[in-house]
Amino acid sequence: MFQKLHHVAYRCRDAQETVEFYTKVVGLKYAAGEQSPEGARPYGEEVDLIHIFFECGHGSYIAFFDLPSSPPMQADPNTPSWVNHIAF
C-alpha cells in the first residue's frame, strides 16, 4: 500500500486563471511551473504545454496542464457535472 499521493493532474483552460484561482481563492501555495519549449516531446509526442503545481500539504500536490495549441476540452455528455470534482 502506498504511503502518500504525490500529485494528481487535470487539464485546465488557462494556466494564469488557474494560478489566480488556486492561490487567491483556494489559498494553495504555487509550487512550480514549466512551459515546454517549441518542438518539445515531453510525453512522446510534440505538444505545446504549460504544467503547474500547487502544494496541498504532506508532500502532495495538485497539478494542471494547459494545452494552449490543442482544441478546447469538452465535457463528457454521458457524465453528470457533479461527478467530476476535487474535494479538499
Where are these regions (language model features)?
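Conserved beta-strand in the GNAT
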Residues: 62-66
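A short, acidic/glycine-rich surface segment
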Residues: 38-41, 69-75
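Core segments of cupin and vicinal oxygen chelate
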Residues: 11-61
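Vicinal oxygen chelate
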Residues: 5-13, 52-57, 75-88
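Generic detector of leucine side chains in alpha-helical contexts
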Residues: 5, 28, 49, 67, ...
